[in-house]
Amino acid sequence: MHFLVALLIGSIFGILFQRDVRGYGSSMGWGLGFGIFLWFFGPLTVFPVVGRQPLDWSAEQGTALFGSLVGYIIYGFILGTIYAFLDRIWVRLFIQSDPLNREPEGLGLHFLRSIEWGGLAGLVGGLVSIPVLAATGILPKIAGLDTSFGGIGGTIIHLFVSVGIGMTYGLLFRNEAPSIGLGVPWGFLFGVIWWYVGPLTLLPLILTGVYDWRASAAAALLPSLIGHLIYGGATAFTFLLPERRYKRWLLLDPRIAAREERRLRPVGTPAPALWFFALGLGVLLPILLG
């Protein structure tokens, strides 16, 4: 039954967001927003009705169900990533296999440029976020370091991790935004996603073997959420500088310019609504329920 429901939810995701997904990054963002919506729709509304229980939309009930909120967000993130992967396979086999629709650069060169720009952007984002993490006392505890050398060791590990995460940003969010104003919100969303996936899930699993999705645990990590937002915005801003310069060089070819024009999001795209919904609730819910 669980897998049938998951299949149905995945099909609904594809029907609703097919036109809005342009790559891995936007698909992950829509998955995050979809997961938050499912939490409101399922555990807070439909499940009590099916169980013939009174609806309880109080903050106390939300706090009690905070763990399921994180679970739905992680589910939406994974759903969006898998959907984008399958979509890219379809595009590669049935669209870009036509010589007229091939990308101007090969897959290997695209990968190398993405991780190069992303790694540099991640380093800048890591440097920019250091003051916030240090001021809130989070930096010495990065990767579980809590010794007299924790500050130095935490900073070094933080920068290495920032470079690695920046590389993933380059791979996932390349060609998602034509301008800095449209790209930085994607960076903020990327930071929120990594806060739920990293400090709230993966890091506890690596250190202790279990994760803690209680509202109290999220409240203790709120300072790092601010750091992740700053990191995401700075990473996106830095990444867009070489990406836009490279695009200006590509647009000198009229054929590539016409193709890039078709790939731009049309006026009236729902992406700003996603930023408002996912960023607003993704940040406010841990604050209000914690």
Which role does the model predict for each range below?
Residues M1-G290:
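Juxtamembrane/disordered regions of integral membrane proteins
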